[in-house]
Amino acid sequence: MTDNTRLRIAMQKSGRLSDDSRELLARCGIKINLHTQRLIAMAENMPIDILRVRDDDIPCLVMDGVVDLGIIGENVLEEELLNRRAQGEDPRYFTLRRLDFGGCRLSLATPVDEAWDGPLSLNGKRIATSYPHLLKRYLDQKGISFKSCLLNGSVEVAPRAGLADAICDLVSTGATLEANGLREVEVIYRSKACLIQRDGEMEESKQQLIDKLLTRIQGVIQARESKYIMMHAPTERLDEVIALLPGAERPTILPLAGDQQRVAMHMVSSETLFWETMEKLKALGASSILVLPIEKMME
């Protein structure tokens, strides 16, 4: 029998988002063994169950109220949303927040030896894709008629196999397209992972747990986007040094023993510190510059 007091979260069992989703939950302090083949894994330290399923099942589980939360790519979520609307349904869910992983783009690609004069080049053509609804919405907005060839995998081989004239598929580096004699010609949708919640009334204990989880996720993402910086900085150029390092709060300034011309400065910077920034700090007279990763962060 299902325990309705436990928060149920669906995530991808294997694939593009699986490792990052697992890492996010671990960094949020959820102790769970996700290295087994079991469909449902129970957290050791929180009333949370993790359902490990196919990515295209996750929006369905959330929209149908089977699970409380889902970690899913926006591309899969939007495709299912359009699919249900096309069938006359009114799917309900909440997007709690966008996450900082799973970035990709859904793009049109054509054979490298064919001319490209914009989307109109696809008028009347056959296009292979795993995202027929996103493709249709985009080309309908352009007033372009086309024939759809639905494939659930290996979309990039369709033109070479004579199944389609072009493809619409996810792209990260473009290496797979190049290996199959294709080139990316148009981006139709940009996607990241997101956290979604089912519609409907939520038990107070579950909602409190969701709020706690959101706070921790915010802390994890902030920590990944921030660095803890320590340095010795000249007193007379302190404002210039601080201007190079935008942060959530003002830095901590400490005196240096026996040195009236410099101070020790500690701060959390909200931007990734590149070598160019460190070189600018050094040019302003800063020294002993240390840039450290942050494990956890809460403002």
UniProtKB/Swiss-Prot annotation:
Pathway: Amino-acid biosynthesis; L-histidine biosynthesis; L-histidine from 5-phospho-alpha-D-ribose 1-diphosphate: step 1/9. Feedback inhibited by histidine. InterPro entries: ATP-PRT_HisG_long, ATP_PRibTrfase_cat, ATP_PRibTrfase_CS, ATP_PRibTrfase_HisG, HisG_C, N-reg_PII-like_a/b, N-reg_PII/ATP_PRibTrfase_C. HAMAP family: HisG_Long. It comes from Shigella flexneri. Belongs to the ATP phosphoribosyltransferase family. Long subfamily. This is ATP phosphoribosyltransferase. It catalyses: 1-(5-phospho-beta-D-ribosyl)-ATP + diphosphate = 5-phospho-alpha-D-ribose 1-diphosphate + ATP. One of its GO terms (molecular function) is ATP phosphoribosyltransferase activity.
